[in-house]
UniProtKB/Swiss-Prot annotation:
Gene3D superfamilies: Aldolase class I. It is an enzyme of class 4 (lyase). Its EC number is 4.1.1.48. PROSITE patterns: IGPS. This is Indole-3-glycerol phosphate synthase. It catalyses: 1-(2-carboxyphenylamino)-1-deoxy-D-ribulose 5-phosphate + H(+) = (1S,2R)-1-C-(indol-3-yl)glycerol 3-phosphate + CO2 + H2O. It holds the Pfam family IGPS. The keyword Lipid metabolism does not apply. Pathway: Amino-acid biosynthesis; L-tryptophan biosynthesis; L-tryptophan from chorismate: step 4/5. Belongs to the TrpC family. NCBIfam families: PRK00278.2-2 (NF001375), PRK00278.2-4 (NF001377). SUPFAM superfamilies: Ribulose-phoshate binding barrel. It comes from Geobacillus thermodenitrificans (strain NG80-2). GO terms for molecular function: indole-3-glycerol-phosphate synthase activity; phosphoribosylanthranilate isomerase activity.
Amino acid sequence: MLEQILATKREELDTLTLPEPLPEPKRRPFAAALRRPRRALGLIAEVKKASPSKGIIRPDFDPVAIAKAYERAGADAISVLTDERYFQGHRRYLQEVKEAVNIPVLRKDFIIDRRQVEESARLGADAILLIGEALSPEMLEALYQEAYSIGLECLVEVHAKETLERILARFTPEVVGINNRDLHTFVTTLEATKALASLIPPSSVIVSESGISSYRDVRTIRSYGVQAMLVGESLMRQADVERAVYRLFGEDDGNGSS
């Protein structure tokens, strides 16, 4: 599936055009928000309608209302899916969410070319996702440097130990995400975070991604030494996403107490 998605991205690049010049950035610090979270563990809450493996996750999809609910519940950043074909996202969702909230916004897509980096800046993203399994270490580093040169931060995502080691041999990302889901098989286990967290330099913010759906999961990944988590599907499947965030942190009364 990953190879199929990347092939689609290469097709989309054929029609991607960018106007001149690049507007002045109005960025919100992404890594800093995760280093100083509102709770013991930072939360990147995801706005996602569908996925290739699960189909439609949230039929009544209102990205702005969802993002505002996340912010009220104490999320530290918002992740917005912009891929259309496989996740039923859209670039305008990112723009709308950025205008509606006051916390950093991450563009979640399959970025493989510098033009997508510039496009992300134009859409108002504060940070972008770079997937280690989708890029050579050389290309990932080049896109990372391109992003920072125009005021964007990056969440560098890995799943395999070998991918992490190849990246760290070149540079140390400020934020490293450990995807608990194998993008080739879609098998998900928190053991991925356990296996990789200790290999990441202490200067990096470590984010655990995917498969986090309960307060028990939150306590588990925190014990592995991560500073933040990215949670989407388990929140999006709840009718009240604001209350779902409280429950995720063991705050079942919804008033912020544990």
